[in-house]
């Protein structure tokens, strides 16, 4: 099922995000990575502070958002980094549990890939995907480039999207 049209796509450097929205983004990551997935490594690694890091999220309007004075509540989030070798890295992909299987993850990944192509058209895009999502990322054109490894107590696999490849597919939502 595609994400509703009322969803808003946002992107900004950390310094440009209002405190309430930043809190809601941190809470979403905490809920998914720490509470739900029981990740063993800290989420806050300092890379969000890099001015070149772009935080991206989808938000939905509603009464709760209005009561907090923000345009919408974040339902999906990720960050886009630039590696030392010029490659783009997408990470910290999180979708609120109540909004999974609604197309939000795929929509946000599509936006992130478009952003990567605009900002670094010749760069490859890298992800360290949770192993159970390997096929989901493969459906967007990512190729597995390494074996399983543990990160934060969760099985991951290194994947890459080569320049000029990949397009969001209509199959498989998260």
Show where each model-derived region lies:
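Short amphipathic alpha-helix that is part of the acyltransferase structural core
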Residues: 2-51, 55, 59-73
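Conserved acetyl-CoA-binding loop-helix of GNAT-fold acetyltransferases
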Residues: 95, 101-114
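Conserved GNAT acetyl-CoA-binding A-motif
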Residues: 116-130
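Conserved catalytic-core motifs of GNAT/GCN5-like acyltransferases
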Residues: 126-128, 138, 143-158
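Short acidic/glycine-enriched loop/turn segments that link adjacent beta-strands
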Residues: 50-52, 85-86, 151-155
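Conserved beta-strand in the GNAT
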Residues: 57, 66-82, 86-94
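Short strand-connecting beta-turns/loops that link adjacent beta-strands
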Residues: 49, 63, 83-86, 164
